[in-house]
Amino acid sequence: MRYPAIDLADAVVLVTGGARGIGLATGEAFAAAGATVCLGDLDGALAVEAATSLGGYGGGVDVTDRDSFASFAGAVRDRYGRIDVLVNNAGVMPLGGFLDEADTISRTTLEVNVWGPIHGMRLVLPEMIARGRGHVVNICSMAGKLPIPGMAVYNASKFAAVGLTAAVRRECDRTGVSVSAVLPSAVRTGLASGVPLGRGLPTVDPEAVARAVVRSCRTRRAEIPVPGYLAGWDLIAAVTPEPLLRLGRRLVGDDRGLTQLDPAARAPYEDRVAAQAAARKQT
């Protein structure tokens, strides 16, 4: 399907989780293309600082809270009149054994990684559809295609996000609005702190993911793996005999989130997620 073109030099882009990592890199990439960048993040002060450096708008947003998301999206509309591109990037990735993970952490993972995109799309898609143009990018993960030991609930959240994106894309057929899933492999950000990367595990920098997000505004592809050579890997896995697949996974070390984790290096990130979970439990 052909979609109305989005002129990035005149576009208003909203990025959640925009204060660091993939979100910040995405904001920088859109700003370099001439777009007006609006960064929302649970750390509102950091989002304001980052957005100001890009000549845009920043503020606090809790993507699990529809009212908070609506308030930030409304502030963007009040300031710029519309939202042309929404990037649902905010996410959390706790690591550890499934049976060891606290329910509060599991709920937070699902609320951020699944309900965040749900809230974002329900708040922004109606205005895009009314205008007959717009683009939504959900930052999913290759973990939404392939199960990985040590991140069972994160896996579940990303499988859900991939399916959600595909279904909403179909519902938006013939509206002029596109919905894409970007599926990074391991990314060198705080989410992966304490995990040994590389050594057979496809690993990219956040800037590579950001470039894929910006390109999606032109290509409007349904799914964009990063790196690109991972396209179709889920289909290969589906037809590979399980013993051979298990051997390959073991050689790559797909369980390194369980067996090779550096607890001290990982602790600051896990503590931040735990604090978010505790705060939500009190509300």
Role assignments for model-derived ranges:
Residues G44-A45, G60-S71, D103:
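The beta1-alpha1 cofactor-binding region of Rossmann-like NAD(H)/NADP(H)-dependent oxidoreductases
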Residues M121, S157:
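Active-site helix of classical SDR
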Residues A181, L197-D234:
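C-terminal helical subdomain
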Residues Y3-V37:
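Canonical Rossmann dinucleotide-binding motif of NAD(H)/NADP(H)-dependent dehydrogenases/reductases
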Residues L99, I148-A152:
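Active-site loop immediately N-terminal to the catalytic Tyr-X3-Lys motif
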Residues S141:
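Residue(s) in the substrate-gating loop at a strand-loop-helix junction
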Residues G97-R107:
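Substrate-binding pocket helix/loop in short-chain dehydrogenase/reductase
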